Amino acid sequence: METQMASPSLGRCSLWLLLLGLLLPSASAQALSYREAVLRAVGQLNEKSSEVNLYRLLELDPPPKDAEDQGARKPVSFRVKETVCPRMSQQPPEQCDFKENGLVKQCVGTVSLDTSNDEFDLNCNELQSVRRLRPRRPRLPRPRPRPRPRPRSLPLPRPQPRRIPRPILLPWRPPRPIPRPQPQPIPRWL
């Protein structure tokens, strides 16, 4: 009898555990990882961009330390680079190669890790060339090079006289006389 009484309470308890187990994965599935949220933001950047080509995530700065509240907006900082894929191709940017000497943009803003919230607040600015961002070393005057000793001149070979071809002589022939027209007699009956 005692076993039959414990059985309904055990069934209820297992039912509650089953329901709780089903609810927990769905709640955690709604929260995006920091990287996934940034990739969605890059997707929206590509949709709203007026550029010819798509942008792809180049570098992602580390996430903020206070990642406790999954629904709150999180500050993000990342860089995107222009790809070879046209924006109208509808191809995922991750499948596109970076464009050689493509445009690089630094993006700063906030994203939400909640899948139900698609709002992103981003500000992207074009980066200057990497060489320009590095500090320049002070230029010191270069020491003057020591004069090099002149090499000894070697005797140059004598130039060979240039051969001029001799004209080909043909046997001489007297010129032919040019035929001249004979004068016609004037008729007398005139």
From Swiss-Prot:
Cysteine pairs bridged by disulfides in the record: C85-C96, C107-C124
Gene Ontology MF term list: lipopolysaccharide binding
The organism's place on the tree of life at top rank: Eukaryota
Coiled-coil portions: none
Sequence segments annotated as region (Disordered): 133-190
Claim: Transcription regulation is one of the keywords in the record: no
Keywords (A to Z) from UniProt: Antibiotic, Antimicrobial, Disulfide bond, Pyrrolidone carboxylic acid, Repeat, Secreted, Signal
Composition bias type Basic residues, residue spans: 133-151
GO cellular component, one term: extracellular space
InterPro entries: Cathelicidin-like, Cathelicidin_CS, Cystatin_sf
Membrane listed as a keyword: no
Subcellular locations according to the entry: Secreted
Signal sequence range: 1-29
Any one GO BP annotation for this protein: antimicrobial humoral immune response mediated by antimicrobial peptide
Propeptide section residues: 30-130
Stretches with biased composition (Pro residues): 172-190
Database matches in PROSITE patterns: CATHELICIDINS_1, CATHELICIDINS_2
Positions where Pyrrolidone carboxylic acid occurs in the chain: Q30
Family classification: Belongs to the cathelicidin family.
Protein function: Exerts, in vitro, a potent antimicrobial activity. Probably due to an impairment of the function of the respiratory chain and of energy-dependent activities in the inner membrane of susceptible microorganisms.
Protein name: Cathelicidin-3
